[in-house]
Design a protein with these regions (language model features):
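Exposed, low-structure sequence patches enriched in small/polar residues
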Residues: 1-340
Length: 340
């Protein structure tokens, strides 16, 4: 196949005041089918889940629109940011799933057993998505803390097909959180945060149930430093999941810690011993939603390990180089050495 495209890019920006502005951006893009998707070859590595390519697959065309509004008041320290992203696609590359009710021949010598499924990429219209994120920040001077409030919403409309019947899966995510970020002094700072997301998935697939799940994250970071250069760092996070499939509704703690000392002249060097996942509870839990399936997964991840690091800060390198140049010029002005 051959493809041709017209891919426009447009941007509009307006500055309302010295503190606020808005930018709108549009871009057209394409998503080409892969070689594997175009090849009319049947994959039989898993007899229960056979896959096939589609040589008639077309490219997908996506319209993308982004809007960003910013407000910053440097005098009061307040700021507000709003981001909204919209996408729509024609000829969206999705998957068609056929579940055999009886043994079926799909190619010469290839039989799809009863209750097995055949997956094949197809083009479908109707894909849409929206995502947004809003954040507001304000300083609270009497406790030397910045408070950041954030909220967001995302939506995706995913077209698919099962047994020649078109289906639509709608996925909505609502999230919000708050962060208290403090820098009490040169020697003490902390960060306290809470975030929650509520996920709702609806599908028109036959016999499918609508699902909801909640993910909550609470975190605390504390950094302590003394005048002699010794420091202690702690980062503690709790992750809690509810509403997922059996075995994935869990709550666990992730604690990373470090101790070290700043050394050498002007404390340019740092020697630090870190331990990751002190409690050996780290996990990776996720839900993946596509046009035809909703999958909860739990993946093994690297748990507790230790790391010893040495860091040297070169921030004064340019100053030393300039000082050497000044010394050369100074000696030259004194007329040292033989002349011509």
């Amino acid at each position: 196949q051959s493809f041709s495209n017209f891919l426009p890019n447009l941007m509009w920006r307006k500055k309302f005041t010295a503190k606020s502005s808005i930018r709108v951006f549009y871009r057209g893009s394409t998503d080409f089918p892969s070689i594997n998707q175009l090849q009319d070859v049947v994959g039989q590595s898993n007899p229960l889940r056979i896959s096939s390519g589609n040589p008639f697959l077309k490219q997908s065309y996506t319209n993308f629109l982004a809007t960003r509004y910013t407000f910053t008041n440097s005098q009061t320290g307040q700021s507000f940011f709003a981001n909204i992203f919209l996408r729509s696609a024609s000829n969206y590359i999705s998957n068609a799933i056929y579940i055999a009710s009886a043994d079926s021949s799909i190619q010469q010598g290839i039989v799809l057993k009863a209750n097995s499924q055949l997956t094949k990429p197809i083009n479908l219209d109707g894909y849409k998505s929206l995502s947004s994120f809003f954040t507001y920040s304000i300083p609270v001077k009497f406790i030397k803390t910045n408070i950041n409030l954030n909220a967001g919403f995302s939506y995706s409309r995913l077209p698919g097909q099962t047994n020649y019947v078109n289906i639509i899966t709608d996925n909505k995510v609502y999230n919000g959180g708050v962060v208290f970020a403090s820098n009490i002094s040169e020697y003490v700072d902390f960060n306290l945060s809470y975030n929650a997301s509520f996920n709702n998935t609806n599908t028109t697939a036959l016999n499918a149930t609508n699902t909801n799940y909640v993910n909550q994250s609470t975190g605390l970071q504390i950094n302590l430093l003394d005048k002699k250069g010794w420091f202690v760092q702690n980062n503690i996070t709790n992750q809690a999941y509810s509403g997922l499939s059996a075995g994935n509704n869990q709550s666990f703690w992730l604690w990373n810690a470090a101790i070290g000392k700043k050394i050498l002249k002007n404390q340019a060097g740092e020697l630090k011993l870190s331990v990751f996942d002190l409690l050996k509870q780290n996990q990776s839990i996720a839900r993946v939603v596509d046009a035809n399936t909703i999958t909860d997964s739990q993946t093994k991840v690297l748990q507790q390990y230790f790391l010893l690091t040495f860091t040297y800060n070169l921030k004064n390198f340019g100053v030393a180089k300039q000082q050497a140049k000044n010394d050369e010029e100074h000696h030259g002005m004194r007329g040292g050495g033989p002349g011509f």
